[in-house]
């Protein structure tokens, strides 16, 4: 993996209804949950995403790729990859992919409120795993 420009990195947990977003820092190698972006049939709220890019000015993008436990692709793998390509094209930043096996389960275990969506926490876990691999 080529190390991106140091600074802020934005991470995504892609879903057809919701997209979790986390913000990370390559210097401290930490990430925090930031937002849950609405998505309708896989079409993200690009205005919301643009506001996040304007606010945080990330140097790179990380997208979790949903994979089966045996490492094979599943139904959401290609849509997540396409989402990453669209992000890179729109915002002119390098995109990095990381397998996101079990990130939603880990996010569920971490969260404190049981009635809240955890997509942003799943994005945090994805981003933390990517930062740990730098």
Swiss-Prot record:
Its main location: cytoplasm. It comes from the Bacteria. Pfam families: RuvX (PF03652). Coiled coil: none annotated. Keywords: Cytoplasm, Hydrolase, Nuclease, Ribosome biogenesis. It is an enzyme of class 3 (hydrolase). InterPro entries: RNaseH-like_sf, YqgF, YqgF/RNaseH-like_dom, YqgF/RNaseH-like_dom_sf. One of its GO terms (molecular function) is nuclease activity. Its EC number is 3.1.-.-. One of its GO terms (biological process) is rRNA 5'-end processing. It is found in: Cytoplasm. GO terms for cellular component: cytosol. Belongs to the YqgF nuclease family. PANTHER family: POLYNUCLEOTIDYL TRANSFERASE, RIBONUCLEASE H-LIKE SUPERFAMILY PROTEIN (PTHR33317:SF4). NCBIfam families: RNAse_H_YqgF. Could be a nuclease involved in processing of the 5'-end of pre-16S rRNA. This is Putative pre-16S rRNA nuclease. It comes from Hydrogenovibrio crunogenus (strain DSM 25203 / XCL-2) (Thiomicrospira crunogena).
């Amino acid at each position: 993996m080529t190390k991106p420009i140091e600074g802020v990195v934005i991470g995504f947990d892609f879903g057809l209804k919701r997209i979790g977003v986390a913000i990370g820092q390559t210097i401290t190698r930490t990430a925090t949950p930031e937002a849950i972006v609405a998505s309708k049939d896989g079409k993200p709220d690009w205005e919301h995403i643009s506001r996040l890019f304007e606010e945080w000015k990330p140097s790179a993008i990380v997208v979790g790729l949903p994979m089966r436990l045996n490492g094979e692709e599943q139904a959401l793998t290609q849509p997540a990859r396409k989402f990453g390509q669209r992000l890179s094209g729109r915002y002119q930043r390098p995109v990095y992919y990381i397998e996101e096996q079990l990130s939603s389960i880990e996010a569920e275990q971490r969260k404190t409120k049981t009635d809240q969506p955890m997509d942003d926490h799943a994005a945090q876990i994805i981003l933390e795993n990517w930062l740990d691999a730098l």
